[in-house]
Amino acid sequence: DTNYKCLLWIDTLNDKPDIVSEIVGIEPSRKQIKGAHMGGKKPPEAIWKINTWEFVSPTRYAQNLWLLQESFEDVLNMMDRREKEFIAIAKKYDNINFQLQSTTYLTPVSFKLDTDVLYKLKKYHGYVCFSIWTWIN
């Protein structure tokens, strides 16, 4: 089985990622802080260039495209429960990204999301990108 998940990440520019948690009342799955050291590398490569607040959908073991859609819906449903707060974040930073991650190179980049999901992405000024999932939380 291929392991799929949706990662929501918000670039908080020069603010610490904790500000998102304070506004939306949800702790991130992970946060990256500008200037944080990446083990084993020497500066300047060791420095993150952006601050990010990241939330990962529950893992899906998908054998069909429908489960990929569900991973987006997991994240969007979480956001909808705090809609006003996430819209405020979207306006503040204008950089909310939804990243579909896959453990294999079979990620269908032409995958089409349902209209209602696309509408919700638009509401949050969201962008969708695809990548290979190379780490385990």
Annotate each PLM feature.
Residues 1-137:
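Acidic (Asp/Glu-rich) sequence patches and key acidic residues
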